[in-house]
Amino acid sequence: MGFIQVFLLTTCLSKVYVVHCVEVDDIIADAIQDTYLKPQRDFGVGNDTIPETGNSFAFLQKQKNDEDTIARAGFKYLSFIKNLIQRSGKSFGDLESSDEYQRSFRTQLCDTITPSCKKYKYSSYRSADGLCNNLRNPTWGVALQAHARYLHPVYDDGYNSPRQRGRNGGVLPSPREISNKVLAGGVTTPPDDKRNLMLFTFGQFVDHDLTFTPIVVGRNGNTLDCCGVDASDPECYAIEIPTNDVRFPGRTCMDFSRSIPTPTDEGCSIGPRQQVNRLSSFIDAGMLYGDSKRFNENLNGRVGTLRTSSGDILPPGGICHTSQAEDFCQLAGDERSNEFPSLGGLHVVFLRLHNMIAKEIRQVTGLSSQDVFLETKKIMGAIMQQVAYGEYLPAILGKDTRKKFCLNLRRNGYWNKYNPNVNPTVKNVIATAALRYGHSQIPPELGYMTRMFAISRVFKSEDVFMDPNIVVTQQGQNIPDLARFLLGTPARKVDRQIENAARNELFPDVNGVTFDLMSFNIQRGRDHGLPAYNEWRKLCKLPVATTFSELQDHNSDTIARLQDVYDHVDDIDVFAGGISETPRADAVVGPLFECLLGWQFKELRFGDRYWYETKGIEGFSRGQLREIRKMTFSKILCETLNLDEIQKEVFNLVGSKNPRVKCSSLPFMDLSEWKKSFFPFVDWSRFFTSG
């Protein structure tokens, strides 16, 4: 008997545990053997282009070849948990709460090596994937790690099977039925009389800086056909379409694949299925650059700039469907840049801003191309934080919420409240529910608006999903007109009434088969084991309803619709309950999502060692910080799109309190402050760790 086993046995006997630890060791060892003897799920090499009959939305989300290792480890972990339950005769809950089993599990299976952060301690630049942002907990916020959680997941079997049962034991209603009955119908909500479509667009842009959850592929490496040949695959979780569905008559099934699994605690403890975030959990403009060294290098152009194509727009190489022969898919740091034209246009805006800054940094400092790229990338991350917290969050969260979660920026000086004990990792409920509030703002149409602010052309949203034509046509000459349309068109209010384009006409394939984004959101929450709506209200210290009539932040019509589809108030899915709340007067989202988003954005600030207001090598000099604070989203649009006029409050509609002003009257940062900085020679390549 080895030293560790003797130690464990002594510990067990001294505490008079019912099960001796040696027996526990044997049970776990047998479960390990069972796991490795059984064949594991395998993945082939999938297509790099969308199959002719495939769906671009699912193709975008499918796991990449370099994520196969993570998925394999996740499936092996789940297989082990299943075998351990069978071998031990215990429930998953008992195993998870057992000190003996957890201790033996760590001893026999945990081989995680904590990365060394010595070379990052004095680095001015964050790593591409977020590694060692936190020197004590190097993997917090890192790309390709599990989403963290505020609440323990609720799986039907405790650890893996999606949440499908309600409080009374009955099967939860189909997400499509919820979508039909709760998220549609009734009196149409009028457009927002204060905010514009640019708010929706920037919200999507920020979301793509923070979260991207890949889905499982089949054994051939391609997306699963869960309504066809792959229907029996355990990773299929197809959505049932009601027989009386008006939009999908004759269809009974909507394709849906589960998110790839990853172990709890990096495989060092017995726990439930977790989901992977492909991106780093920091506001660092990662959607421009990617979250790996490989992506950074692929997009890097000459003298520290990003690669472009004719018209100073993104280079070709992304994923999309093109409607015109001369069009091309745009390539950006995030694969979803072609998802919606307004998003694609914003990618062009920030691409141009990077290149403008890089060229001037090169001129005033004489730095090498690599150093110019790194310094410009750092500045762009700071600008993203400045706009996100200085303009975007004040537009969606109420004043009290921003104060409660310390989200207001300083006007001068440094902010020195970085806390290494704060885990910034994006939480599962944020990625899967709260940040999806913007799906309620998807407009029925996009368009162009001339310099005289007259609409010149309109496009139905369902016709432009995954089609970059509006952006790339005529080498991007119409992007300013698209921006004016976004600035001058009222936003949709965040409520239960979802646009037809998002609920019925999402991402049609070549056969005209479409999807329902709301059904996807509800099903994804169940796939991830998100607890029901009331549990999140409790977490946020909001009133919790015991009956439908006690729902406090829903109007009577919404309450009636929720009661019509759910058996019990405790069954309400968090997305359905959160998106249908009535926002407070100064907020865009309802109280629950306001709480969750405020909490997460606080962690993203307090838990980021490279937060731009920070003093030290991770931040900027006082002069540089002063210049960054001059930057506003309105001036960014002016400079990159050659606009003449714009409203100062860029996410609000033009009005007497928010008139258009000359772009020339808005300040821009003075990059001569960077000439005063001293850049010692450093081998910067060592700060890129991801392949």
Regions found by a protein language model. Name each.
Residues 537, 550:
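Residue-level "edge-of-site" marker
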